[in-house]
């Protein structure tokens, strides 16, 4: 057993966990943050994507000890109260989801993509960057449309700050 301390969605967290505990299981089983989904446990599907220190990471392949001291953000931590994050709003407005299982991971990956590419983001880049996120329901068209729409919203919001 090890004690880990990290910040999750802006709150300090300390947990005693087995050394083999994956971050996704700490989030879901110990902290009840069930928006982060377990799809494959092999880093293939992207349903478990969270941000560690601002970068998208598949939490099913990160040991909790590797995140010790880190700042972790989950899908539950990106909205501001009842106000959706621009990426969440764009997915809603552009019908970027169907069953919703992949959506939290898609949104977390997409936020990271927009943060890295800014106004240089185009459709080909979005499609390439989302290759690690699998959706079984959609043809990805509305997901890509959502990401590009959100990129505009996020860039406008950042410029206003």
Residue ranges and their predicted role:
Residues 1-161:
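Signature of N-terminal electron-transfer/Fe-S-associated modules in redox systems
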